[in-house]
């Protein structure tokens, strides 16, 4: 299940800012970047809607897997997990989260990816 629109982070300016100044948390299979939100970087139609939770994005490049089917499965798995973990956490409103999978992530079991995601969220102060 995909992230709801209110939780999605979109736009190249947001991604560029997260890459430049976001606080990084490294794992074996992914990198998590977190920063306070900057609404001026969002598109005008998204600025009007206040966020009830943090906004999240996933980056899964073709280096992870050449097969789009595999990348989409990983994306759906992590979207569902992020939704379950963060959707009802109002205390996290005002933060942006970017998760980038490393090429080695394709060799990991789904349970290992979810465990690492949880540990990175906890180290970033977003865990439960």
Swiss-Prot record:
Instruction: Identify which top EC class this enzyme belongs to.
Output: hydrolase
Q: Which UniProt keywords apply?
A: Endonuclease, Hydrolase, Nuclease, RNA-binding, tRNA processing
- Check the record and name the InterPro entries matching this protein: Ribosomal_Su5_D2-typ_SF, Ribsml_uS5_D2-typ_fold_subgr, RNase_P
**Enzyme Commission number:** 3.1.26.5
Output the Gene Ontology cellular-component terms. ribonuclease P complex
Q: Enumerate the GO terms in the molecular function aspect.
A: 3'-tRNA processing endoribonuclease activity; ribonuclease P activity; tRNA binding
Its quaternary organisation is: Consists of a catalytic RNA component (M1 or rnpB) and a protein subunit.
What this protein is reported to do is described as:
RNaseP catalyzes the removal of the 5'-leader sequence from pre-tRNA to produce the mature 5'-terminus. It can also cleave other RNA substrates such as 4.5S RNA. The protein component plays an auxiliary but essential role in vivo by binding to the 5'-leader sequence and broadening the substrate specificity of the ribozyme.
Protein name per its UniProtKB record: Ribonuclease P protein component
Origin organism lineage? Bacteria, Bacillati, Cyanobacteriota, Cyanophyceae, Synechococcales
């Amino acid at each position: 299940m995909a992230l709801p629109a209110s939780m999605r982070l979109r736009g190249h300016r947001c991604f560029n800012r997260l890459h430049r100044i976001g606080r990084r948390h490294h794992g074996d299979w992914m990198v998590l970047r977190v920063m306070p939100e900057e609404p001026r970087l969002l598109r005008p139609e998204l600025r009007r809607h206040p966020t009830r939770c943090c906004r999240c994005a996933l980056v899964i490049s073709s280096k992870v897997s050449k097969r789009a089917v595999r990348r989409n499965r990983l994306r759906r798995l992590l979207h569902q997990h992020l939704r379950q973990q963060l959707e009802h956490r109002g205390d996290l409103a005002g933060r942006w989260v970017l998760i980038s999978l490393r090429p080695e992530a394709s060799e990991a079991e789904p349970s290992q990816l979810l465990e690492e995601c949880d540990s990175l969220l906890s180290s970033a102060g977003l865990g439960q």
